[in-house]
Amino acid sequence: ALMGNHNLPVAVQEQLGRLLDQGHLSVASGAFSYDQVVRRSIKELAASGVDAITYPSGHTDKLETVVLRAMRTGINQTAMDISQHNAESMDVDVMELTAHGGARTGDGKADFTNHSWWQGKLVSLSGQPGYLTLDDIGYGDVRGFAGANCRHNWHPFWPGVSKPAYTQETLDEYNRPKFPYNGQLLTEEQADRRQRACILGLYGAVR
């Protein structure tokens, strides 16, 4: 549901979906930059009276948050789908997950909500023993791999031939607190969260 100063018509709800679809295609094709598409979408929706989105759960997000998350998620899912299609066309069953600093830690346990736990590891599309499964990484769950705001991807991996892209030392370094802020050290995840808050504020200011 869309929330503004009044109950908004279905036409405005459809506008949100249309703008996000068009924005995704514009960025994926290279016609416009990510920043250009986000700014345009936010301005058009704001002009229609939309300033926040309320989900069935009752949770409400600001317009800037919704647009940024939808664009980022859609673009990454397209890249992930291409990688999976390439693997299947080559009859490859094992995929190597990418890794990056600032991966979310979820509840801190060894489960799919903790992206820093499974990133950089190998996953079997068919569920072969000795590898992570699609369930282990939360494939298909909004909180897991390729879910909302997830920046991870995966690539075909040939056991016995391919060389792992990440060492355990590299993965550990991603999670080490090393960014100074107000007299304390932040992990990259914490620093990214603060940076995103600043970016959202800037997008809101230029509406």
Predicted regions and their residues:
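Catalytic core of tubulin tyrosine ligase-like
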Residues: H152
